[in-house]
Amino acid sequence: MTTPPVPGQPQPPSHVLRPESIERFDRGNGVVTIPFVGKWNTTGNAVTTGMTVFAPGTGIPLHSHNVEETVLVFDGEATAVVGEEEFELVAGQATWVPAGIPHCFRNRGSGSMTIYWVYGGRDVTRTVTATGETFEHLSDRDRGATPAS
């Protein structure tokens, strides 16, 4: 027997998350995020997870978060900038980025590139390095994918 949902309250997701049935968050310019677990669908999560798919030649501007993040290159080829260092990554390789450290990921390949990300917290913010602007992760202001440079 299941408990009826409380109107206006987030509900736990299925124990099996199927990307094809999850509403996508379009960041613009060929970058799309598939949010898995977060405060939008769970009440007690301690992490926030999802996948982001990058078209060839796209990326997300240099930014930082208020919580740590690990990113796994799930498919394709990426350039990762973490702090002052730049890394070339392929599928199966991952990064760990402490809170407050500027970073970004760009698709350096000729096909799509997909990352799987995990944030170490429920209330995640993004601060754009170039402007200092801070906003809630996956809010309407969290768009603005750019061509890779």
Task: Explain the meaning of each model-derived region.
Residues T52, E77, E85-F87:
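Well-ordered beta-strand scaffold positions
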Residues P56-T58, N66-V67, E85, I101-P102, ...:
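A generic "binding-loop/recognition-motif" signal
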Residues T52, W96, G111-R126:
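A short hydrophobic beta-strand segment most commonly corresponding to one strand
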Residues E68, V73-A78:
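Glycine- and acidic-residue-biased ligand/ion/polar-headgroup-sensing regions
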Residues E84-A99:
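Short acidic-glycine-tyrosine-enriched beta hairpin
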